[in-house]
């Protein structure tokens, strides 16, 4: 899992007012695990590559399928998301991200699929056939709901 991918989540109180007083024990200051705890339910991607298939999951709950672009270019898969300014609970916000991951050489790029669940989880998967490396080409992958 990659824990540094927040796709437009709000700020937390401790992001704005960290403990800065020198009289406070260091044990009560920002925890090393704070980012892990805060990210447990937002903006995380998970990459898995096992013997049968390669899978990537992204939390893109703030984007609709037409605001997402998924492409395979050479040995990489690229995902981009962008939406214009819209109103939320705290005012107006626009979001944009771009991620790029290297595909294992055994993934059959022509069989890669991508789907978006109702709760905003984007899943890309491709089989790892036993035949070894496959031909490489550039192509766009449609995001299906």
Swiss-Prot record:
Q: Which SUPFAM superfamilies match?
A: HSP20-like chaperones (SSF49764)
Provide one Gene Ontology cellular component. cytoplasm
Q: Where is this region: Disordered?
A: 124-145
Assigned keywords, A-Z? Cytoplasm, Eye lens protein, Metal-binding, Nucleus, Zinc
Q: Which residues bind Zn(2+) 2?
A: 90
Compartments (UniProt record): Cytoplasm; Nucleus
Which molecular-function annotations from GO does this UniProt entry contain?
Answer: metal ion binding; structural constituent of eye lens; unfolded protein binding
Family to which this protein belongs:
Belongs to the small heat shock protein (HSP20) family.
Subunit annotation: Heteropolymer composed of three CRYAA and one CRYAB subunits. Inter-subunit bridging via zinc ions enhances stability, which is crucial as there is no protein turn over in the lens. Zinc coordination is achieved at least by His-83, Glu-85 and His-90. His-83 and Glu-85 come from the same molecule within the oligomer, while His-90 residue is provided by another molecule. Can also form homodimers and homotetramers (dimers of dimers) which serve as the building blocks of homooligomers. Part of a complex required for lens intermediate filament formation composed of BFSP1, BFSP2 and CRYAA.
Q: What does this protein do?
A: Contributes to the transparency and refractive index of the lens. May act as a chaperone, preventing aggregation of various proteins under a wide range of stress conditions.
State the protein's name: Alpha-crystallin A chain
Native species of this protein?
Oryzias latipes
């Amino acid at each position: 899992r990659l824990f540094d991918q927040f796709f437009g989540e709000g700020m937390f109180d401790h992001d704005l007012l960290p403990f800065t007083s020198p009289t406070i024990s260091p044990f009560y200051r920002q925890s090393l695990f704070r980012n892990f705890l805060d990210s447990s339910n937002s903006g995380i991607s998970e990459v898995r590559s096992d013997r049968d298939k390669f899978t990537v999951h992204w939390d893109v709950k703030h984007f609709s399928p037409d605001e997402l672009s998924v492409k395979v270019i050479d040995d990489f898969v690229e995902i981009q998301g962008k939406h214009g300014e819209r109103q939320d609970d705290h005012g107006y916000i626009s979001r944009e991200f771009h991620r790029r991951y290297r595909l294992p050489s055994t993934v059959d790029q022509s069989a890669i699929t991508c789907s978006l669940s109702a709760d905003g989880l984007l899943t890309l998967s491709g089989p790892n056939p036993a035949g070894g490396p496959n031909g490489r080409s550039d192509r766009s992958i449609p995001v299906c709901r």
